[in-house]
Amino acid sequence: MRTVVFFILVSIFLVALKPTGTQAQIVDCWETWSRCTKWSQGGTGTLWKSCNDRCKELGRKRGQCEEKPSRCPLSKKAWTCICY
């Protein structure tokens, strides 16, 4: 039940984003926040894979969360999954 509520809240938040140019901004926010932010970690394993698992799925050796400039227009910096 907790996962369902979390998914609904994240979905509402993403729908509420009004892209100024393209739908890519919503995707950028999703990719930025979906694996590495503390408030979104509840979805890891259910809604999306962990950073390390996602990177391995992409054929990389490992992945880790690092603070980087954000691609999402709603924040300047964000914890983002980086694959190695």
Curated annotation (Swiss-Prot):
Assigned GO CC terms: extracellular region; membrane; other organism cell membrane
A Pfam family per the record: Macin
Disulfide bonds: C29-C72, C36-C65, C51-C81, C55-C83
Principal place of residence: secreted
GO biological process: defense response to bacterium; innate immune response
Organism from which the protein derives: Hydra vulgaris
Keywords: Antibiotic, Antimicrobial, Disulfide bond, Immunity, Innate immunity, Membrane, Pyrrolidone carboxylic acid, Secreted, Signal, Target cell membrane, Target membrane
Tissue specificity comment: Expressed in the endodermal epithelium.
Record's keyword annotation contains Disulfide bond: yes
InterPro entries associated with the record: Macin, Macin_sf
Function: Cationic antimicrobial peptide potently active against Gram-positive and Gram-negative bacteria including multi-resistant human pathogenic strains. Is not active against the Gram-positive Coccus species, Gram-negative non-fermentation species and against the fungus C.albicans. It leads to aggregation of bacteria as an initial step of its bactericidal mechanism. Aggregated cells are connected via electron-dense contacts and adopt a thorn apple-like morphology. Hydramycin contains a belt of positively charged residues that separate two hydrophobic areas.
Protein name: Hydramacin-1
Induction (UniProt): By bacterial lipopolysaccharides (LPS).
Family (UniProt): Belongs to the macin family.
Domain of life: Eukaryota
Pyrrolidone carboxylic acid modification, residue list: Q25
Subcellular location: Secreted; Target cell membrane
